[in-house]
């Protein structure tokens, strides 16, 4: 977790993430950024969904490197949360090779539970504090 409403993550780029020979697949990098930006919602304790995700691939990301992703919230208007991120090679202060911008929309917790598998719901019933971390008012079958 970063200093304010921001986070820093390390993404190890392995052979499993390869697209073109020796390089990370852009779709998998997009996934990593969506996850990092989505984790910002935990800092707000607000369940949310990705409404928009824009990625700028500035330089190739080689297999065997570590991508340092820093994400921050840049604004909030009602249920809309705006955020940005960048990915750097060579360390947290290294060269920026990927940039992202996103819009998340805060939704009720039930949005996630309506299609959840039965075993997932059962696990939540056993451990309700998992959801209370995000939404302190939420209860399963109150």
Predicted feature descriptions by range:
Residues 16-17, 50, 54, 90:
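Preference for short coil/turn "hinge" residues that link or interrupt alpha-helices
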Residues 10-12, 54-56, 70-72, 86-88, ...:
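Residue-level recognition of well-ordered beta-strand positions that form the cores
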Residues 35-74:
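Hydrophobic beta-strand-centered segment that forms part of the acyl-chain substrate-binding groove
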Residues 8-14, 27-29, 109-111, 115-117:
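Charged, low-complexity, helix/coiled-coil-prone segments
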Residues 1-24, 138-142:
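Catalytic strand-loop segment that frames the active site of acyl-thioester-processing enzymes
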Residues 61-63, 74-142:
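HotDog/MaoC-like acyl-thioester-processing domains
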Residues 16-26, 31-43:
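A short, contiguous structural element within a folded domain that forms the immediate neighborhood
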Residues 3-9, 27, 49-53, 67, ...:
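A generic structural signal for short beta-strands and their flanking turns/coil linkers
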């Amino acid at each position: 977790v970063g200093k304010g409403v921001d986070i820093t993550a390390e993404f190890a780029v392995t052979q499993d993430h390869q697209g073109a020979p020796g390089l990370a697949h852009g779709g998998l990098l997009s996934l990593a950024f969506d996850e990092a930006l989505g984790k910002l919602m935990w800092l707000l304790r607000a369940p949310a969904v990705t409404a928009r995700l824009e990625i700028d691939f500035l330089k190739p990301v080689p297999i065997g490197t570590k991508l340092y992703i820093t994400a921050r919230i840049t604004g909030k208007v009602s249920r809309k949360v705006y955020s940005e991120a960048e990915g750097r090679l060579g360390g947290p202060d290294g060269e920026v090779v990927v940039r992202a911008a996103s819009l998340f929309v805060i939704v009720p917790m039930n949005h996630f539970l309506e299609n959840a598998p039965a075993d997932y719901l059962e696990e939540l019933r056993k451990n309700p504090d998992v959801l209370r971390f995000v939404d302190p008012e939420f209860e399963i079958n109150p």
